[in-house]
Regions:
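Short, flexible domain-boundary/linker segments around small modular repeats
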Residues: 1-17, 31, 37-67, 85
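A positional "C-terminalness" feature that preferentially activates on distal terminal regions of long
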Residues: 95, 103-128
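OB-fold/S1-family single-stranded nucleic acid-binding modules
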Residues: 72-73
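Eukaryotic compositionally biased low-complexity/IDR segments
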Residues: 88, 116-132, 140-149
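Non-Sec secretion/translocation targeting segments of pathogen effectors
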Residues: 24, 133, 148-156
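Extracellular/lumenal glycan-associated surfaces
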Residues: 16-34, 56-63, 69, 79, ...
Length: 156
């Protein structure tokens, strides 16, 4: 049975992220780990790439979770990569059509249904995260030199 027929019968597509298989579930707006279904990656937590056709996020390979870069990140994570995956139409055009009440074939001319894809991985040293961490370290050093800033930042 071909992939499109399987999808129309309700079999959800999968994508490989750093060697981990994820089920694409657009109805719930998430990628669900095939081996550990409680490990979910929410599409809402991902950033749209500049081209508007992909999502970007940092992925912790060990914990199988999205890694959030924040102002308190002062060390570079060791088991993480920058991940790029297609947007919803690239992941599951049939699922997108169903989400909006359209026929299953609605998006297939521009977005053919394909075999499960593989995420594009970029090492952290080429992701911009090291520079972000260095900037956070500098801010932390400035805060340590000015105790008022520490108190100000920590107050509710």
């Amino acid at each position: 049975m071909d992939l499109l027929k399987q999808r129309k019968m309700g079999i959800l597509p999968e994508i490989d992220i750093a060697g981990h298989a994820y089920t694409v579930d657009l109805r719930l707006n998430e990628l669900r780990n095939v081996e550990l279904p409680n490990k979910k990656l929410s599409l809402d937590e991902m950033v749209t790439a500049p081209n508007g056709r992909h999502y970007l996020f940092f992925y912790d390979i060990e914990s199988r979770s999205i890694l959030h870069a924040s102002s308190d990140m002062v060390t570079l994570p060791t088991n993480a990569v920058l991940v790029e995956i297609p947007d919803e139409l690239g992941l599951d055009p049939v699922g997108m059509a169903r989400k909006y009440g359209l026929s299953d074939e609605y998006f297939l001319k521009m977005h053919p249904y394909e075999k499960a894809g593989k995420a594009t991985l970029t090492s952290l040293d080429k992701s911009g995260l090291p520079e972000f961490v260095v900037a956070n370290q500098k801010l932390l050093q400035q805060d340590l030199q000015d105790p008022q800033k520490i108190t100000f930042r920590k107050s509710p």
